[in-house]
Amino acid sequence: MSRSSRQSRDRELPEGAPGTEASGLVLVDKPAGWTSHDVVGKVRRLAGTRKVGHAGTLDPMATGLLVVGFNKATRLLTAITGTDKTYLATIRLGVSTVTDDAEGDVLQTRLANAVTPERVDAAVADLTGDLQQVPSAVSAIKVDGQRAYHRVRAGEDVRLDARPVTVRRFEVTGYRRAEDGTTVDLDVEVDCTSGTYIRALARDLGEALETGGHLTALRRTAVGPFSVTDAVTLEDLAVRFTSTELSVAAAGLFPVRRLSGEEASELSFGRRIEATGTEGMVAAQAPDGTVVALICDQERQGRPEVLSAKPEIVFAPATAPAAASTQDGGRT
């Protein structure tokens, strides 16, 4: 790239664009009609770096929180993807669709005039807790190496296996019956584990009530500790690139273990250090406050009685420990 081309590109970047040097997370309020991949492409252009990813797909019709990582923070995304999610949704009873949402062709219509709030509450209770959920056939799940939605569009009858999910909360916050009694719209709020399909919940609720059902609106309001109230629109991001620095994000996601300089160096080389005594992932923080790695206590191979902290994800480049000064009793 010529110098003039680089200067032209830099002038187009918003204030605060990180380029390829800084790393962090961006909380984006995804608009309807955009795919998650579309959002990643937009953030790439605004950030000035190609290394961008997201922590969990949102369907094009859905809006709300999409956690996007850039540069080294993309390594955090796997851990974020596995966290619980919160959604606001609207379910229409009385109509089933191919996709289990409003974007698919109608499969069947059945009168919902026999639906009552009491029956809805009972069916919702049965769909709360630990479930074996069959994902929507029109999904990004791979079947023999090909996305399920590609197979459905090619005319195949795709049947996906049930998967364990947990719906921690399934609350009906609004109930609206059509004047002619043909459909009932339910506004709901759902807290669930990663991998739960809200479209499938709408479908299963409709089946339980013998009316059929599909999703007409979906908004993700939380991913783990992150809230959509802290998210920015793509329009705002184009003016000022707002992000959370990698070390701050990691320290907010996991318990923090403060390291000595020697421990930080060991982890930067991928070596184990003394066990943390904490269950699960821990953010290992160097003396200067930067997060060197995410670590987890594990048994040593061949010595199951000995635990040590193993680096699962290393962010810092390999660095030798700083030489001790004479004031610290070191040798010159």
Can you describe what each PLM-predicted range is?
Residues S2-P31, H37-H54, L58, A62, ...:
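Accessory RNA 3′-end/elbow-binding domains used by RNA modification enzymes
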Residues R45-G48, V67, D157-A202, E207-E210:
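The conserved catalytic core of RNA pseudouridine synthases
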Residues K51-T81, A137, H150:
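Glycine/acidic-rich beta-strand-loop module
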Residues V68, A89, G145, L201, ...:
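Residue-level signal for inorganic ion chemistry
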Residues T78-L93, V158-V172:
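Structural signature of FAD isoalloxazine-binding scaffolds in flavoprotein oxidoreductases
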Residues A79-P135:
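Acidic, low-complexity central loop/insert segments
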Residues S139, V143-R168:
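Extended alpha-helical targeting/anchoring segments
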Residues A140, R147, V152, V184-T229:
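Pseudouridine synthase
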